A protein has these predicted regions:
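Catalytic cores and adjacent flexible loops of soluble metabolic enzymes
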Residues: 1-330
């Protein structure tokens, strides 16, 4: 059985510059709860606890968004993303448990899953579903990623998620990752696509073909940079490719709501998203790259490539200016 997981109200908050309102969350969850979705992820784009001047202040608090979603979800599981360092057990995880969050996804750089251990163990001890998310998956080979997945399983994660944060993968990459990890762990394996190189839906379908049990998507692809894999496109192609009778209408209704309410934030492929995907860099850096490259008089492509060489990850926005200065001094 495949569990479809909706990140519109979390990853989509990146695109909306962390301004998604409680009313929008309520309206969206009302439809999502009838769709057959397994989980609906809600919160700041960088996860609960991340609202800050560094990565963006949210216009509505995590608490309000989660309480709103909780009141409008009965069938689908209320889920959150969190990154150790932004989120702490006392400040963020315990309040989320008290609100009634069902699923916690703990995200780390693919080479640093050990930083998730304390959070995963705490969440698991409180009988909540916990997934380990390996961000920036393209920065290691398949065998190394499988080794990290084994560690997440050992910590207590009930699923491990391959996150293509930079939208760098093509389907053959996804095939290799999913196969390697499924051969290495006994827990469920999931995949989270980004669409920098217009491969999001194709990559999600490849993950399905290789037996991934959890597939992420967002309505209209609403997400950081050039967005995520379009949830409605995944569903319609899944129906066609796997002869499944998944109901399509609610997904189209969610898509229409996003199209109506988030017109100014809908993702599109730009030269910047292509450059970030090619360089293997988190596309949420696009506003800073654009501003700083103009300020320093250097090309965006040159700056993207240097960020890729230095393997910057989300949360390291403050380093972009330093790197631009280094390029000026070459």
């Amino acid at each position: 059985m495949v569990n479809f997981y909706d990140v519109t109200l979390r990853d989509g908050n990146h695109a909306a510059r962390h301004t998604l309102s409680a009313k929008f969350v309520a309206d969206y969850c009302d439809i999502a709860d009838k769709s057959g979705l397994w989980g609906v992820e809600v919160g700041h784009g960088n996860g609960i606890g991340a609202s800050s001047f560094l990565v963006g202040k949210a216009s509505t608090s995590d608490q309000v968004l989660l309480e709103t979603a909780r009141a409008h979800l009965g069938r689908a599981k209320l889920s959150v993303h969190l990154i150790p360092g932004f989120a702490t057990i006392k400040k963020d995880i315990i309040p989320a448990i008290d609100i009634g969050v069902d699923v916690f996804r703990v995200g780390t750089h693919v080479t640093e899953v050990d930083t998730a251990r304390k959070h995963i163990e705490f969440i698991s001890e409180h009988n909540k579903i916990c997934h380990g998310v390996m961000m920036m998956s393209h920065t290691v080979d398949a065998r190394s990623q499988a080794a990290q997945a084994i560690e997440l399983e050992r910590f207590g994660a009930s699923a491990v998620i391959v996150m293509d944060s930079a939208g760098h993968f093509v389907p053959s990459d996804v095939r290799e990752r999913i196969r390697s990890i499924k051969d290495s762990v006994d827990v469920a394996v999931g995949f989270h696509a980004h669409n920098n190189l217009e491969m999001g839906v194709a990559n999600a379908l490849m993950a399905l073909e290789e037996g991934a049990q959890i597939i992420d998507g967002s309505s209209m692809g609403l997400g950081a940079g050039s967005g995520n894999a379009s949830l409605e496109a995944i569903i319609v192609n899944y129906r066609r490719s796997f002869a499944d009778d998944q109901e399509l209408t609610p997904y189209l209704e969610m898509s229409q709501l996003v199209e109506l309410e988030c017109q100014d934030f809908l993702p599109r492929t730009t030269s910047s998203s292509i450059q970030s995907g090619n360089a293997g860099v988190f596309s949420g850096f696009a506003p800073q790259v654009r501003q700083i490259s103009n300020e320093f008089g250097i090309s965006q492509e040159e700056l993207w490539q240097e960020l890729g060489k230095r393997r910057l990850v989300a949360g390291q926005e403050s380093m972009i200016r330093e790197i631009a200065q280094d390029l000026m001094n070459l």
